[in-house]
Amino acid sequence: QIQSISFPETLKILAERAGIPLPNNNSRQSTDPKQKERDALRKLNEAATRYFQSLLKNPEGGLSARNYLASRNFEAETLEKYRIGWATPTWKGLLTHVKKKSSVTQQQLIQSGLIIKKEDSSAVYDRFRGRIIFPIMDLYSNIIGFGGRSINQEDQPKYLNSPETLLYQKSETLFGMDQAKQAIRKENQVVLVEGYFDQMRAVQHGIENVVATCGTALTTKQASMLRNHAETAILIFDSDTAGRSAAKKGFDILMEHAMNVKIVV
């Protein structure tokens, strides 16, 4: 319930951890339309991630994005670890690619949040264009959504996220939690930062028990997840007005969850 996954999904995860094979039950699966929708969205997100990664590695098409990431001092190994990608500034690049490569429907693409349908017409276009792409993962490294960051000041907003879907609930997700959870348990401490780059940079420098709120105020569900992994939280947010406000709110919520809380100023 805390991790917002169904009973069959929980059973599958626990069986995989214990190395116990589960019997196939195709009739049960076929009667669970929501589960089938979630599975389809996961496959679609995986296909999109591979596409975005290929664009970043493209010798010419991904050059501007690679130069930008190099200017932020990110190593190739870090980019690969997080499966960072690039969405070119075209209106239908992903849409065209996915429809060629799979039997996915336009409605599934809309439900995933990867494409947008114009309100006044039937026209559709890619949500992410001209942006660095951050795949957002659940606790088990399933890709549930995406964040995109523009590399040019004139392209606003600076950050753009997937809308909420069957897989992605923003208030229940922390960027990097899938990779950080073991280190958080080991240290019995979690470091909270604001953005994707903040979290990635910390890990690149050897600090592994770090997660990011991605510019939003910490929620009760996120705090509950953290409390299940550690007793102490350290908040390192920006020193601007918004950052100080987010730190104060996060402090209060974490204290309500009986955590030891420190704020770095």
Name these PLM-found stretches.
Residues T78, I143-G145, N152-Q169, N188-V191, ...:
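TOPRIM fold recognition
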Residues G62, Y159-A183:
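Juxtadomain coupling helices with adjacent low-complexity linkers
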Residues R131-M137:
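A short, hydrophobic, proline-anchored segment that marks a local hinge/packing element in signaling
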Residues Q1-S112, I116, R131, S162:
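Non-catalytic accessory segments of DNA primases and related replication-initiation nucleases
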Residues K100-R129, D178-Q189:
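Short, basic/aromatic recognition patches
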